């Protein structure tokens, strides 16, 4: 039987989502598979909606797995969470259709990046916030970001290690706002390139400080040259909010579009 899980994790202590082999360092995937396999009393493999890098967090990562073990969804949720490290928790578990796929059934994916914007570095929440001491104009960042909307070639914002076959993505929404001392960037797209959100944020920061004009982002997008864009923002400020699926899959409301 196929199940879908919603998984929350603090990525600070992991080398990313993906299991990278025996000597690849701790991963969220390896921890989750070990816990599920213990509950199932048999090997379990999971497929996720979107892989995250080292230090990046997950608010509602969605995975699917198959198992012949007879367990109620609540049993999977509680039993698996009890076997996971404190930095990972299963938020929900539901039966899924046999043809549901955590990655390929997703219609969109959402990320949030949070920057503490003040002169003094953070003592609290430093694992879940990035820090920028220079004053940022969040309104200018928001205006500049709107140039990225729609289906475009995002070569200027992909990492050199990106293995995607092409750089075209459909960026459906991007919003920048200030909430007290925090500047927050929320992004939604059909899919993302490696480091795409962090590279966008790194470039928007240069607009926010006034080092670059608002129309610079549009120029970067058109130029498709990663070497002239801003630096990659640090990983700790980034959270994978989660994917969105059509209602036909009958998943919880937070991941249904």
Curated annotation (Swiss-Prot):
EC numbers, comma separated: 5.4.99.12
Positions with a binding annotation for substrate: 111
Protein keywords: Isomerase, tRNA processing
Pfam families, sorted: PseudoU_synth_1
GO biological process: tRNA pseudouridine synthesis
Residues of the active site: 53 (nucleophile)
Protein family per UniProt: Belongs to the tRNA pseudouridine synthase TruA family.
NCBIfam families: hisT_truA (TIGR00071)
Name of the featured protein: tRNA pseudouridine synthase A
Record organism: Xanthomonas oryzae pv. oryzae (strain KACC10331 / KXO85)
């Amino acid at each position: 039987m196929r199940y879908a899980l919603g998984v929350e994790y603090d990525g600070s202590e992991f080398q990313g989502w993906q299991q990278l082999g025996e000597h690849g360092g701790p991963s969220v995937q390896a921890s989750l598979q070990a816990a599920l396999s213990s509950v199932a009393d048999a090997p379990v493999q999971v497929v996720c909606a979107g892989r995250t890098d080292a230090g990046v967090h997950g608010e509602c990562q969605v995975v699917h797995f198959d198992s012949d073990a007879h367990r109620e969804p609540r049993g999977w949720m509680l039993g698996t969470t009890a076997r996971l490290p404190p930095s990972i928790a299963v938020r929900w578990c539901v039966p899924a259709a046999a043809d549901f796929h955590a990655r390929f059934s997703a219609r969109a994916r959402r990320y949030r990046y949070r920057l503490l914007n003040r002169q003094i570095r953070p003592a609290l929440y430093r694992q879940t916030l990035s820090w920028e001491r220079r004053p940022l104009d969040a309104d200018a960042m928001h205006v500049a970001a709107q140039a990225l909307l729609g289906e475009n070639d995002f070569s200027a914002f992909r990492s050199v290690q990106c293995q995607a076959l092409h750089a075209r993505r459909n960026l459906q929404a991007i919003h920048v706002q200030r909430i007290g001392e925090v500047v927050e960037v929320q992004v939604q797209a059909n899919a993302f390139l490696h480091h795409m959100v962090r590279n966008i944020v790194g470039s928007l920061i240069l607009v926010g400080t006034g080092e670059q004009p608002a129309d610079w982002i549009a120029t970067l997008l058109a130029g498709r040259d990663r070497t002239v864009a801003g630096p990659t923002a640090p990983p700790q400020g980034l959270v994978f909010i989660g994917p969105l699926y059509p209602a036909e899959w009958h998943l919880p409301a937070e991941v249904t579009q």
